[in-house]
Amino acid sequence: MKASLLNKLEILQDRFEELTALLGDAEVISDQTRFRAYSREYAEVEPVYAAYKEWRKVQDDLEGAQALLKDSDPDLREMAVEEVREAKEQLLTLEAQLQRMLLPKDPNDGRNVFLEIRAGTGGDEAAIFSGDLFRMYSRYAEKRGWRLEILSENEGEHGGYKEIIARVEGENVYGKLKFESGAHRVQRVPETESQGRVHTSACTVAVLPEPDEQAAIEINPADLRVDTYRASGAGGQHVNKTDSAIRITHLPTGIVVECQEERSQHKNRARAMSWLSAKLNDMQTSAAQNALASERKLLVGSGDRSERIRTYNYPQGRVTDHRINLTLYSLDDILSGGVDAVIEPLLAEYQADQLAALGD
C-alpha cells in the first residue's frame, strides 16, 4: 500500500480513537448537538477503521507465514506457502476496499435535483429531441422509484419542448444524474425530410442539486422582481382562472426562473425560490469545479454546459459518450429509460480517476 494512503489511515485511526473517547464523555453526552455530530462522524469513520484493522491483522499474518518459509520442517514450509498466497489475496482485496472508502464523498450525491432540458441548434427537430430526452429521464426516474414533477414547460411548435424544467426527488438522484449535464447531440432523419438526409440537432441538459436550508444561498428580497401570470398548459380549466404562475428575476445576475405547474401561487413561489437558489449555488461552484477539472485533467465531471458529451445516432442505433469513448448499440433501450448503461461506466471512470489522484 502507498505510504500516503497508510498515513491517511493512521490519522483516521487516531480520529476514531478520539471519537470513541468523546462519545463516552459526560460533557459531550449532555450536549445533544455535539453528540449527534460526533455520532455521525463515528458512523462514517468506523467502517474504514474496521477494514484497516483487518488489513493490519492480515499483514501480520503474512509476515508470520513468510517467516515460516525458512523453517526446516518441509510440512510447515508447504503450509506457509498456502498461507502466504491467501494472505496476499486478502490484502489486495482489503487495499482496494480501503481505497474506495477513502475516496472523497460528494456532499450533493444524496440531494434531489432540478433537471433543465433546452433545445439548441436544429429548430423543430431539437425541440422534438428535447421531448425524447425528457421521456428518457422520466422513464429512468420511474424505474428507480423517483418522483418527477414538471415546474415549467415551453412546448415546441411541432412537438417536444423548447425548454422543460423538472424537479426529481428520490434516493441518490444527484449522485446518478450529475454527469448528464452538457450538450446532447442527435443524428436522425426528420419526419419532414423527403430526401432521407440525416440531420444533426442538439439539446443542452443541466442537472442542479437542490440545496437544503443550510446550503442555500441567502437571497436579498430587494434583489428580486416577482411577476405573477396565468398558467398555460396542463391543469385543465383552473389554469385560466387565477394568476397562480410565478416568474422570479434575480436582478444582480439576470437569472429568471418560472414555475406554473402547481395550482397554488404559494407552492409555485416556493418551488421557484428553491430552483433559483440551486442556480445561484451552481454559478458559485461551477467556476471552482472547472478550475479543478483543468488542473487534474478530469476525464468526466467538468459539468461544462457547452461540452458535447453524447451523441444519439438513430440510423445506426448507436449512443456514444465522448468523455470516455463509450459506444453502445442499444439506442432504443437507453431512450426507454435504460440510462444506467451509460451512467454506470461514467461513474466507474470517475471513481478510477479519483483513485489515481488519491495517492498523489
From Swiss-Prot:
Keywords: Cytoplasm, Methylation, Protein biosynthesis. Methylated by PrmC. Methylation increases the termination efficiency of RF1. The modification N5-methylglutamine is found at residue 237. GO terms for cellular component: cytoplasm. InterPro entries: PCRF, Pep_chain_release_fac_I, Pep_chain_release_fac_I_sf, Prokaryotic/Mito_RF, RF-1. GO terms for molecular function: translation release factor activity, codon specific. Disulfide bonds: none annotated. Its main location: cytoplasm. SMART domains: PCRF. It holds the Pfam family RF-1. It is found in: Cytoplasm. PANTHER family: LD18447P. Peptide chain release factor 1 directs the termination of translation in response to the peptide chain termination codons UAG and UAA. Belongs to the prokaryotic/mitochondrial release factor family. This is Peptide chain release factor 1. It comes from Pseudomonas putida (strain ATCC 47054 / DSM 6125 / CFBP 8728 / NCIMB 11950 / KT2440). The gene is prfA.
